[in-house]
Swiss-Prot record:
The keyword Transcription does not apply. It comes from the Bacteria. The keyword Isomerase does not apply. This is Uncharacterized MFS-type transporter YfcJ. One of its GO terms (molecular function) is transmembrane transporter activity. One of its GO terms (cellular component) is plasma membrane. It comes from Salmonella arizonae (strain ATCC BAA-731 / CDC346-86 / RSK2980). It is found in: Cell inner membrane. Pfam families: MFS_1. Belongs to the major facilitator superfamily. YfcJ family. The gene is yfcJ. Keywords: Cell inner membrane, Cell membrane, Membrane, Transmembrane, Transmembrane helix, Transport. It is a multi-pass membrane protein. PROSITE patterns: MFS (PS50850).
Amino acid sequence: MTAVSQKTHTPPANFLLFRIAFAVFLTYMTVGLPLPVIPLFVRHELGYSNTMVGIAVGIQFFATVLTRGYAGRLADQYGAKRSALQGMLACGLAGAAWLLAALLPVSASVKFALLIVGRLILGFGESQLLTGTLTWGMGLVGPARSGKVMSWNGMAIYGALAAGAPLGLLIHSHFGFAALAVTTMALPLLAWAFNGTVRKVPAHAGERPSLWSVVGLIWKPGLGLALQGVGFAVIGTFISLYFASNGWAMAGFTLTAFGGAFVLMRMLFGWMPDRFGGVKVAIVSLLVETAGLLLLWLAPMAWIALVGAALTGAGCSLIFPALGVEVVKRVPSQVRGTALGGYAAFQDISYGVTGPLAGVLATSCGYSSVFLAGALSAVVGILVTILSFRRG
């Protein structure tokens, strides 16, 4: 009877999970489309420094960090669906600020300020979206399949980066920054329409500790996740300028290589954290990420840099679900949304801090040096993971 019941209910649950993941893909294009364009816009069109490029990219993630606690409480207390849909709306509003930056006849400083406002709104929306969809998906398929939920969401996120990066550069080069802004306004509305009828899941009853008390349970996997995040942050922030400084074409396809390898790994091996546990998977993944970043650092030509980006994407792919499985094991169900929000915040902090610091490093030592810094961070991540879980 149990087997029959599982066969009856698993396909609908998986289909609902697919709908949620596809909506994440559409909404996260608001991150993927402008990611390679913003450094070029800030550096070449507005005339600001590499440090300001890092701030423009990284400040989104600080906004995400600061609203993770709110997103987790919203998902836990009022329902994950509300959090996810609210995030989609905010991501669409970010495009409106960028449209103003593109069209208003104002100074470069005002345009930069409007760009920053849009990035802050996008960061707020991202925290609601990702915390909501993760908690929503686990409510649909159960915590025993938490690795699958995180894998599907990750495929959607990095699939959006893979598709969005070259598309964003194409839109910007042919139609300008205003067209890019309009596109980012429209995609979350499509996601809302596609996802709005998916059933909501009830909030869990029970005592709800604060985010900071939950952090005490999750900081070890969170630290490993943060050190992993440096690699993606330096690629996302400086790969366009790195390629331009070397006279290489296809900068947008570097993020496609990263995202494509990321998604492929999730598709082929996303089951591994649930099957083998997160620690072993995380250590191997960090080794692969290290190799990819070293290849980017030493790349003498564009195609080798593309291979390095793909290796980095393959390495980063399974780390979030691998260490996330350890998070789910450590917390009660009624604070799962808060815990996942806090866990993801470690990665957001990494992204936010890396941008400006890598900008200073790039100015002093050249763009290639930021990839060496990412590789060293991944090595430290391996050591931290081994030491943190050595008794497990």
